């Protein structure tokens, strides 16, 4: 999975928006490897494209990503210290360049291990399954 990082020798300052996106990716998929993390980032990009809002606004929309339910940035910044954070920050920095086709332009997903599917997934067929996440285009 190619992510464009630009000049690898520059030091980047991480913006608040990039932190929000990276934390969302980490909270949702850090155990899913690079493919799973890319997939979640692609869903964020797809929602931003469809809803005409920024990717960080997508992440913070009420009840969209459970990691943010009742939490603030300071409560979750510790995730930026896990080994997968470097890749998540790279995805966050380049979110508008990601291939949304990677997940079939999916705008929803859920963990496949959930005992009960979310209400919106009932009767829907996933466009893709990557790791332990099923992806849907609704």
Per-segment meaning from a language model:
Residues 4-138:
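Bacterial extracytoplasmic/cell-wall-associated proteins, especially those involved in peptidoglycan
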